[in-house]
Design a protein with these regions (language model features):
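Conserved phosphate- and dinucleotide-binding cores of soluble alpha/beta proteins
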Residues: 1-310
Length: 310
């Protein structure tokens, strides 16, 4: 889906640049749906009319997603992460309520920058508040970079011909060697489970898929490459009304490992922060049990002893 054509004959794939540009480059014929409600964004997201074989026009409303409701658990996690983000940091914000909770805790920061996969309402709010300026970025200074957008109608209007925002293909935004050129890159992403070694299951639980492969591991590695960078994997300590611990001895068989133990840095729950990078198996296990829900710590400790980790 593309924006209306500009005076130079270009359409903008602003809301979903991601893989679309690569598909267009390889397509024998390009058919565009041109929607009058799609913003015209800047960046490497434009298709010239000469490349288009056919098009159809529509004015259907664009799918909207507002900011999620933030409860005390999400708020606590957000505060832990926000306290570790310095002024001038460049941020990658993943999808979900907890990353959004982090954004809401950043209103007292100064001169933050954005190099991310998804741009949403939380980022727009910080721009409007003067918190995000991109002034101290040393890679694409002055510009926010993203590959797709998901939010409200206000966000889509904010994107329209905004010189501070550029939309690029996902192989550009998510390249760890490019994103990692930002000093102080702080990557914030959610997961469903973390095991004693720090492996994260963000896409499936066992053989049941819940999400596709996103940019989590890309940006964890980018933050590891960044001078002063940090990556945060965030999750509530429990699921299903406190009946299941999300800190587990091992991931279920069949679980897709989204972030591996050798890449993980910080894991954050409402009970604190576990710093895992460079730590031994015993130290990782102790740190993760320390941020598990108190009702499960004894059980997890016994499991760790049986696994000869403690």
């Amino acid at each position: 889906m593309a924006s209306p054509m500009d005076e130079h004959g270009y359409f903008s794939l602003s809301l979903g640049t991601d893989y679309t540009m690569a598909a267009i480059e390889r397509a024998r014929a390009v058919v565009l749906e041109v929607n009058s409600n799609v913003p015209f964004a800047n960046g490497d997201c434009h298709v010239h009319i000469s490349r288009v074989a056919a098009l159809c026009e529509s004015d259907d409303p664009i799918f909207e997603v507002g900011l999620p409701k933030i409860g005390p658990v999400q708020e606590a996690i957000g505060k832990y992460v926000a306290d570790m983000i310095p002024d001038g940091a460049t941020l990658q914000i993943g999808y979900g309520g907890i990353p959004d909770a982090v954004v809401m805790q950043l209103t007292d920061k100064r001169d933050l920058g954005i190099h991310t996969e998804m741009v949403g309402d939380g980022i727009m709010t910080l721009v409007e508040a003067g918190v995000i300026t991109n002034r101290r970025k040393n890679y694409h200074q002055g510009k926010m970079l993203a590959t797709f957008a998901l939010g409200s109608k206000k966000l889509y209007q904010f994107m329209n011909r905004n010189p501070a925002l550029e939309m690029h293909p996902v192989d550009f935004t998510n390249d760890p060697f490019l994103a990692g050129q930002n000093d102080n890159l702080h990557a914030i992403n959610a997961t469903m489970q973390v095991d004693f070694m720090g492996q994260c299951g963000s896409e499936s639980l066992g053989y049941t898929p819940y999400s596709g492969t996103g940019g989590q591991s890309d940006f964890v590695r980018a933050a590891n490459r960044s001078n002063g960078g940090k990556s945060f994997i965030v999750l509530p300590s429990t699921a299903k009304n406190d009946t299941i611990s999300r800190i587990v001895p091992t991931l279920q068989p069949g679980t897709h490992v989204s972030t591996g133990k050798n890449d993980i840095n910080y894991v954050v729950t409402e009970y604190g922060v576990a710093q895992l990078r460079g730590k031994s198996a015993k130290q990782r296990c102790q740190a993760l049990i320390g941020i598990a829900h108190p009702d499960f710590r004894g059980e997890l400790h016994e499991m760790a002893k049986k696994m000869k980790l403690l």
